[in-house]
Curated annotation (Swiss-Prot):
Transmembrane segment boundaries: none
Alphabetized HAMAP family for the sequence: RapZ_like
Swiss-Prot/TrEMBL keywords: ATP-binding, GTP-binding, Nucleotide-binding
Coiled coil: none
Protein name: Nucleotide-binding protein SPH_1680
Protein task: Displays ATPase and GTPase activities.
Binding-site list for ATP: 13-20
Length: 296
């Protein structure tokens, strides 16, 4: 039986260089993550990890917040080098002194190594102490000119494998404008201009997932024309969302009550996008009127 390999990324570097954003990015990439892991506990922790999946992935922030960091890190890394079944890399995040000072001033935090309160003194001491670790690192990322989004994209490019690259997911949902626009929607489209099945007694109590309503909505010429334009707009931009490191794209289709037109459009959009992408379908307000009637 082939032994499963554990993939580990040790995230470290200068305070204020972006380790919090980095560890969140690794979580989005499918890694199990821990922030502020004491170096001395790392070998024991790896021994206790119960490997349930092929090629498990861990990303751990190990930095100077642990008081014993500088005295323990080298011995721990030497031990990891000799551990069977472990593939580990060190990601070192850095930034220019001027940028680090600006970030500390913006957050009004004090540097942990600035005994006299001068941020720059703490940065210089930390840089000196971390120099050997930086030289050992397989991946060094300078975040001076990077926004959080750009850092996420950089890490996705460096640490995504083929499986992770395909983990981009699309959520297609319907909703009713009368109940508010979904706050997590990335793209919102309004189909209230289309003929409304609500005004047909035989369709009023059905929804867009029911065939009579779906056919009524989608068989109108203006519906087909709009849908083709909608699909032509959405499909070409999906690779760009994936490339920038976005893990979930939420597309919301809205009509007045969220029961008929938007549901039908969301249903058809899911059918077409599912041919090439991982897509989930949801209808936020589809059954809202039914629930209201049942309460009365």
């Amino acid at each position: 039986m082939t032994k499963k390999q554990l993939h580990l990324v040790i995230v470290t570097g200068m305070s204020g260089a972006g380790k919090t954003v980095a560890i969140q990015s690794f979580e989005d990439l499918g890694y199990f993550t821990i922030d502020n892991m004491p170096p001395a506990l790392l070998p024991k922790f790896l021994q206790l990890v119960e490997i349930k999946e092929d090629n498990p992935k861990l990303a751990l922030v190990v930095d100077m917040r642990s008081r014993s960091f500088f005295s323990e890190i080298q011995a721990v890394l030497d031990e990891l080098e000799n551990q069977d079944g472990l593939d580990f890399k060190i990601l070192f995040l850095d930034a220019a002194d001027k940028e680090l000072v600006a970030r500390y001033k913006e957050t009004r935090r004090s540097h942990p190594l600035a005994a006299d309160g001068r941020i720059l003194d703490g940065i210089k001491l930390e840089r000196e102490l971390l120099a050997p670790l930086k030289n050992m690192s397989q991946n060094v990322v300078d975040t001076t000119e990077l926004t959080p989004r750009e850092l996420r994209k950089t890490l996705a490019e460096q640490f995504s494998d083929q499986e992770q690259a395909q983990s981009f997911r699309i959520e297609v949902m319907s909703f009713g404008f009368k109940y508010g626009i979904p706050i997590d929607a990335d793209l919102v489209f309004d189909v209230r201009f289309l003929p409304n099945p609500y005004y047909l007694p035989e369709l009023r109590n059905q929804t867009g997932v029911d065939e009579p309503v779906y056919d009524y909505v989608m068989n109108h010429p203006e519906s087909e024309d709009f849908y083709q334009h909608l699909l032509a707009l959405i499909e070409p931009i999906l690779p760009s969302y994936q490339k920038e490191g976005k893990s979930v794209l939420t597309i919301a289709m809205g009509c007045t009550g969220g029961q008929h037109r938007s549901v039908a459009f969301a249903k058809r959009l899911v059918q077409d996008l599912s041919k090439n992408w991982s897509v989930n379908e949801g209808h936020r307000d589809k059954d809202r009127r039914k629930e209201t009637v049942n309460r009365s």
